[in-house]
């Protein structure tokens, strides 16, 4: 692609004011886009709107600075039709709630005018990060999605050591391990299901978590050869970095490659261009499609530009 061509790149994300620029994948992607002289239009959820059949947003042109004190500067605010953009990066973090779903409808209207949306709005709706794993039964451990407390109790009695988690959260939020004879079983399950009014996911505990909960990144169907093995603190079940876990960079194992290569064609077909797989041992546990992280951790230790791979894809796709 000619260096003279500047794309109009929109990004929809949570407040840039509250990010950690040393670890934030969205910030890393935007830095790469800025380095390539693309024009960045920053948006938050409140900025999106639909007027008749047309998608609009109040955007702010933004300049990024790699400075831990002040890392961004808004240059100009304007209301535009999203059809004026070349690409929109949907990087809004969960919760995956009705507001998130509504935003994908608006983005889909922009997509229908020819704007490239990463990841594809319809697939963001269809591919819940927890439930989507059930489309690949050979890759996952025994998994129950229910809001029925009796079914959860039966599952617990069978395995005697289980993990229960919500379907719409991130970063290890509200994940519980329930061991054999845990006196708190009832109160945990009642709260997780909101007294049988809310679905959750239940899985047997995987002891391989002690070796790390691996985050494997895939760009346009191509697995990154290194992953981040997130290891839980002593006394903690959750290995997520957001929950205090320690991240170690390691090469993909043979099993990791098999899982990633098996999933890649489906992800690519669905327009899921930037994806993070979570793997414990040899089991797939989540398929992160909303705003996958761990780009910075890998790039800081390995001679690879994951953000560069993503921007290469965008430039090639838009300029075909």
Curated annotation (Swiss-Prot):
Broad EC category: ligase
Cofactor(s) needed: Mg(2+); Mn(2+)
EC code(s) of this entry: 6.3.2.3
Domain (ATP-grasp): residue spans on this chain: 130-315
Gene3D superfamilies xref list: 3.40.50.20, ATP-grasp fold, A domain, ATP-grasp fold, B domain
A molecular function (GO) term: glutathione synthase activity
Statement: the UniProt record of this protein carries the keyword ATP-binding: yes
Superkingdom, natural source: Bacteria
Catalytic activity: gamma-L-glutamyl-L-cysteine + glycine + ATP = glutathione + ADP + phosphate + H(+)
SUPFAM superfamilies per the UniProt record, alphabetical: Glutathione synthetase ATP-binding domain-like, PreATP-grasp domain
Annotated binding of ATP, by residue: 156-212
Transmembrane segments: none
InterPro entries (alphabetical): ATP-grasp, ATP_grasp_subdomain_1, Glut_synth_pro, GSHS_ATP-bd, GSHS_N, PreATP-grasp_dom_sf
GO cellular component, one term: cytoplasm
Keyword ATP-binding: yes
Alphabetical UniProt keywords: ATP-binding, Glutathione biosynthesis, Ligase, Magnesium, Manganese, Metal-binding, Nucleotide-binding
Pfam family, one: GSH-S_N
Cofactor binding notes: Binds 1 Mg(2+) or Mn(2+) ion per subunit.
Known pathway: Sulfur metabolism; glutathione biosynthesis; glutathione from L-cysteine and L-glutamate: step 2/2
Family assignment from sequence similarity: Belongs to the prokaryotic GSH synthase family.
Protein name per its UniProtKB record: Glutathione synthetase
The species this protein was found in: Buchnera aphidicola subsp. Acyrthosiphon pisum (strain APS)
Gene (UniProt): gshB
């Amino acid at each position: 692609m000619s260096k003279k061509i500047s794309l109009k790149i929109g990004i929809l994300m949570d407040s840039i004011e509250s990010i950690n620029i040393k670890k934030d994948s969205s910030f890393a992607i935007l830095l790469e886009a800025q380095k390539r002289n693309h024009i960045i239009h920053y948006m938050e959820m409140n900025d999106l709107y639909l007027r008749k059949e047309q998608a609009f947003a109040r955007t702010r042109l933004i300049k990024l600075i790699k400075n831990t004190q002040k890392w961004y500067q808004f240059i100009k605010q304007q209301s535009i039709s999203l059809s004026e953009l070349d690409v929109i990066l949907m990087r809004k973090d969960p919760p995956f709630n009705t507001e998130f779903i509504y935003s994908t409808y608006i983005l889909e209207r922009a997509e229908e005018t020819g704007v490239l949306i990463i990841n594809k709005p319809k697939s963001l709706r269809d591919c819940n990060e927890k439930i989507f794993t059930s489309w690949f039964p050979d890759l996952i451990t025994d998994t129950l999605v229910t809001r029925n407390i009796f079914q959860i109790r039966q599952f617990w009695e069978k395995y005697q050591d289980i993990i229960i988690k919500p379907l719409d959260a991130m970063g290890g939020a509200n994940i519980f391990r329930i061991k054999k004879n845990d006196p708190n079983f009832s109160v945990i399950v009642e709260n997780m299901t909101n007294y049988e009014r809310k679905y959750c996911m239940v899985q047997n505990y995987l002891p391989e978590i002690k070796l790390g909960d691996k985050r494997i990144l895939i760009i346009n169907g191509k697995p990154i050869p290194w992953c981040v093995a997130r290891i839980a603190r002593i006394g903690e079940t959750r290995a997520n970095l957001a929950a205090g876990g320690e991240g170690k960079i390691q090469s993909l194992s043979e099993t990791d490659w098999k899982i990633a290569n098996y999933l890649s064609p489906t992800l690519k077909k669905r327009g899921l261009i930037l994806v993070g797989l979570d793997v414990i041992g040899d089991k797939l546990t989540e398929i992160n499609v909303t705003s996958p992280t761990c780009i910075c951790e890998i790039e800081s230790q390995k001679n690879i530009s994951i953000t560069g791979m993503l921007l290469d894809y965008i430039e090639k796709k838009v300029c075909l």
